[in-house]
């Protein structure tokens, strides 16, 4: 069988992923011109490469239409419930670091932890006749973190279609759940991350779709071992 590896199609993620596969003895070349979205691995005739966006990679992995992919852990865990039953996180690759965090306005001086935020959420409806509004693109991770891990139920999620960090200032939400690398954008928008408000430390991962056909395919384990050895 042919094994398909989905890799980022552009930018730093593409360069970093390609460098790791190069070190793993799996040099990748595009098939056709530089704009091609197909590739091959030199010396690995039973492996093909598809160049996709990070969000496309996570979707194709979750649906099992590719065998391996390099994408952010945040995208996988947001995209699918019980994701570990669908995929295996084979290796964390050491690039694409970012945290999914809970951030509140800096002027909320008495809110430093999720417990503090729980108190605010409970009091919010009585004071404002509405639930605490959270702007985010990460509704699944937000629900799991607030409701399951911290027992906070009195909130509503506002889908963020643009710059999430601007939502509190614009009045479209009270707080946010967003991804950040340095925190500088949050600080520029007068937001602070709660002390225990990191939902996920994310980075780029080598992810394998769980397929029964992989059990009898030696190249699957060979790919995993080669990449791990290159880290």
Curated annotation (Swiss-Prot):
UniProt entry tagged with the keyword Nucleotide-binding: yes
A GO biological-process term: L-histidine biosynthetic process
Pathway: Amino-acid biosynthesis; L-histidine biosynthesis; L-histidine from 5-phospho-alpha-D-ribose 1-diphosphate: step 1/9
Organism whose genome encodes this protein: Rhizobium etli (strain CIAT 652)
Superkingdom in the source lineage: Bacteria
NCBIfam families (alphabetical): hisG
Top-level taxonomy: Bacteria, Pseudomonadati, Pseudomonadota, Alphaproteobacteria, Hyphomicrobiales
Purpose of the protein: Catalyzes the condensation of ATP and 5-phosphoribose 1-diphosphate to form N'-(5'-phosphoribosyl)-ATP (PR-ATP). Has a crucial role in the pathway because the rate of histidine biosynthesis seems to be controlled primarily by regulation of HisG enzymatic activity.
Keyword ATP-binding assigned: yes
Enzyme Commission designation: 2.4.2.17
Domain notes: Lacks the C-terminal regulatory region which is replaced by HisZ.
Protein name: ATP phosphoribosyltransferase
Keywords annotated in UniProt: Amino-acid biosynthesis, ATP-binding, Cytoplasm, Glycosyltransferase, Histidine biosynthesis, Nucleotide-binding, Transferase
Annotated compartments: Cytoplasm
Family: Belongs to the ATP phosphoribosyltransferase family. Short subfamily.
């Amino acid at each position: 069988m042919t094994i398909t590896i989905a890799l980022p199609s552009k930018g730093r993620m593409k360069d970093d992923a390609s460098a790791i596969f190069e070190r793993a003895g799996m040099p990748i070349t595009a098939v056709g011109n530089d704009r091609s979205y197909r590739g091959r691995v030199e010396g690995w005739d039973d492996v093909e490469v598809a160049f996709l966006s990070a969000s496309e990679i996570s979707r194709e992995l979750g649906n099992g239409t590719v065998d391996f992919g390099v994408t952010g852990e945040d995208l996988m865990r947001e995209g699918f419930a019980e994701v570990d039953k669908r995929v295996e996180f084979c290796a964390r690759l050491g690039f694409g670091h970012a945290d999914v965090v809970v951030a509140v306005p800096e002027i909320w001086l008495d809110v430093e932890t999720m417990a503090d935020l729980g108190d605010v959420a409970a009091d919010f409806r009585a004071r404002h006749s509405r639930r605490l509004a959270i702007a985010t693109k990460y509704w699944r991770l937000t629900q799991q973190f607030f409701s399951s891990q911290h027992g906070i139920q009195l909130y509503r999620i506002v889908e963020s279609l643009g710059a999430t960090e601007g939502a509190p200032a614009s009045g479209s939400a009270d707080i946010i759940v967003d991804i950040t690398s340095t925190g500088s954008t949050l600080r520029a928008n007068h937001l602070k991350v709660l002390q225990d408000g990191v939902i996920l430390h994310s980075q780029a991962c080598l992810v394998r779709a769980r397929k029964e056909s992989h059990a009898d395919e030696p190249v699957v384990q060979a790919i995993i071992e080669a990449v791990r050895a290159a880290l």
